[in-house]
Amino acid sequence: ERVWQSLSRKPANLSELMRMIGETVYLNGHFLPLPEARISPLDRGFLFADGVYEVIPVYSRRPFRVEQHLERFDLSLKGIRLENPHAQDEWLEIVRHLTEAAPWPDQGVYLQVTRGEDNKRDHPFPAKVVPTVFGMTMPLITPPTEVLARGVSAVTAVDTRWARCDLKTTALLANVLLRQEGADAGHAETILLREGHLTEGTVSSVLIVQQGMLVAPPASQFILPGVTCE
């Protein structure tokens, strides 16, 4: 039996894409329709995955622990030596605008900052470059009631990601490949093990109920600190 998985199918056309993402996005200081958003092919986020992101869940149009999510966002930016382009109150205004412009009460607000557009492809940081700042929102997909009642299946795999998983970077190819291992076998998630120790799922934190207690792997550079878990 195929277990439930979050919606990830490709939209059939631009109109459907706009319904799935929202007609309004934020890009470099401007709110604009999705079809008008343009990013350079020389952007370091495109060439090197040189950027970080954050996802903020929104319930009934109220962002959940938004300050804590923005603090984690800032830590990720510091971790890749990229100055935060906005103060927290500016980020809050971006989140508010995106949330109010979208048709869904429950949403996932996606924020991303890359090191920006360079004039060539070269690994060292450019001397002067303006970060690319992007934001969008999507409907928040939650599991059906029957799935919450019976759970889902998962497979384990060796954690082959890099050594700074505590930073929420856009370099997610290892996560993509590892999760696909589970999807190919009909599982909802792939749980990762590093040297025999549980770290996390490819797209989830792991909490275990053991002898009446809620336990989790200890915080480390191999685990993204979960805002909800805190």
Report the location of each language-model feature:
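Feature captures the catalytic cores and cofactor-binding loops of soluble hydro-lyases/lyases
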Residues: G226-E230
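Conserved alpha/beta cores of soluble small-molecule-handling proteins
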Residues: R2-T190, E195, S220
